[in-house]
């Protein structure tokens, strides 16, 4: 996990809006980026639906929301359509961003 007041690692990933998302384009804005393991699983679906329900509150604060997982863009599009998700999901197939943010790797208990 990235620590507070530390520059966020670069993000450049394909998005469900058919563009490439670049974190640097959001400089000066509030941004929530949440990571999740897999589309359409119980915990990940619950988390995504919670962000979706709260999206109007985040928008009032000029805050963007993005979800990132290792799922394909096709999987993200189906997931987004099924649950009527109103924000973009980003696909990190090679897990480079997930690893930069230290949210992917062997579990340590």
Residue ranges and their predicted role:
Residues 1-109:
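Chalcogenol-based redox active-site neighborhoods
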């Amino acid at each position: 996990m990235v620590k507070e007041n530390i520059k966020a690692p670069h993000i450049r990933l394909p998005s469900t809006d058919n563009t490439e998302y670049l974190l640097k384009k959001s400089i000066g804005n509030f941004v929530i980026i949440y990571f999740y393991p897999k589309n359409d699983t119980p915990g990940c679906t619950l988390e995504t639906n919670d962000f979706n329900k709260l999206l109007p509150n985040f928008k009032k604060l000029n805050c963007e929301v993005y979800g990132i997982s290792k799922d394909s863009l096709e999987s993200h599009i189906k997931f987004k359509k099924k649950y009527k998700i109103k924000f973009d999901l980003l696909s990190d197939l090679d897990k480079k961003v997930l690893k930069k943010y230290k949210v992917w790797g062997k579990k340590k208990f």
